[in-house]
């Protein structure tokens, strides 16, 4: 998990539509305020995501989405390791 992502950082997350790892780039950082469903603030990032695996050549732009900061990873391997860890418990 990335503790302090910055705008412009390339990150990995699980796509909510395909459940597959996706390369993205942070475009903005925001906080979802507390409300009746979530009584605490939830920091998140607006992310452009790409159809590639190399940050130096990310491939075609596929879209934009928002992702909770707790769900962002620096590398694809870190993301895959976190999935393996959560499924073995």
Report each predicted region and the residues it spans.
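Short coil-to-beta transition motif at edge beta-strands of beta-rich domains
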Residues: 2-16
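Exposed regions on extracellular, virion, or secretory-pathway luminal proteins
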Residues: 30-38, 54-55
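Short beta-strand-centered aromatic/proline hotspots
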Residues: 20-34
């Amino acid at each position: 998990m990335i503790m302090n992502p910055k705008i412009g950082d390339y990150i990995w997350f699980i796509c909510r539509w395909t459940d597959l790892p996706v390369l993205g780039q942070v475009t903005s950082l925001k906080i979802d305020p507390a409300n009746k469903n979530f009584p605490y603030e939830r920091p998140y990032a607006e992310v452009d995501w790409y159809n590639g695996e190399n940050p130096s050549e990310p491939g075609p732009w596929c879209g934009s989405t928002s992702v909770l900061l707790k769900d962002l990873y620096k590398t694809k391997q870190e993301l895959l390791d976190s999935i393996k860890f959560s499924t073995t418990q």
